[in-house]
Amino acid sequence: RFNRNMQLLKRQETPTGNIALLGIFSAILAVFSLIIAFVPFTSIAFGLFLPLISAVAAYYVQKKYIPLYMVGASLICIGVTFFNIGDTLFFVIPSIFSGSLFGFMRAKKILPQFNIFIISLVQFILHVIAYYLLIAITGIDMLNVVVSLLNLNSSKDYMILFISALLSLSFGETGLNYLIIEGVLEKFSIETIKEGPIARMVSTSIAFILGLVSILMGIGIISSQAMPIIFVIMLYFSISGTDYLFSKIRPVWIYVLLGFLMIASLFFVAIFYQNENPINSLGLLACFPVSLSLVTFVSILENKMAQ
């Protein structure tokens, strides 16, 4: 029986095999959805592991069946939790879509940092849709409730901060999902996709450019309420690219350069910080990721030239 069950966890070539595998994983998701509906506080913990189910399903089935799975599994989960649909909309459905996309892009060998970025944006969009669906269903806008409790009605920035927080949540959640999914896929002897130096140079370049834009917003040269969103995206690419710098010992002058730029960043923030516009002034904090990205880029170039 064990060997017969394990036959499902391989690339499916027949319609029967594909549908059987997707049916099993849809049923598993339905069970977890019911647990979340009856015990809502489990939604956060399950939210980290639910994408794994869809990722495995999408990895092993033929790609033409993935849209069918995403729609079918979502409708099944909504159907079995009709009495408490909030957590299903906000946690389960995004997990189905993000996990399926992860499995698809994993099979296509798309680099992890771009895989995570795309899925994070999808997660973010689905969270926003779920937020407005909950308002339509319940008639309660939780954001307005929180804003009223904190006496922030006079603030024009609370919506952009909410969007930035939701985007940050999506990046953090997707990053944890990635670690969990990769850890499990390795158990199935699926080859890990390695990030080369060129991919890291692309990430650090994106972080550097977005960081400069954030800094210009912070000192008032560019005026835009989108600064917190740009800052969050910049921070993601900075983190995804600069781990190269600390993966092994680099030449001493690299760390000296990093220390000098970090100290210079402190002085820059202290000089240009504006109390009258604290939200945009937070863009000045991009000096630190920009310094890190620049030094990482230089370190990669130095390493390639030395080879």
Task: Kindly give the residue locations of the regions a language model identified.
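Aromatic-anchored segments of alpha-helical transmembrane domains
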Residues: A30-L34, S74-V80, Q123-I129, L212-L216, ...
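Membrane-embedded alpha-helical hairpins and interfacial helices in multi-pass inner-membrane proteins
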Residues: N115-G211, L216-M227
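Central hydrophobic cores of alpha-helical transmembrane segments
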Residues: P67-I76, N115-F124, V232, W253-S265
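Alpha-helical membrane segments and adjacent membrane-interface helices in multi-pass membrane proteins
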Residues: S43-M105
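Short helix-perturbing small/polar motifs within transmembrane alpha-helices
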Residues: L9-R11, G23-S26, V92-Y132
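Long, positively charged, glycine-interspersed low-complexity recognition regions
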Residues: N3-L8, S238-Q307
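Alpha-helical transmembrane segments
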Residues: N18-V31, M70-A73, S203-S214, M262
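Hydrophobic transmembrane alpha-helices
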Residues: F2-Y69, P112
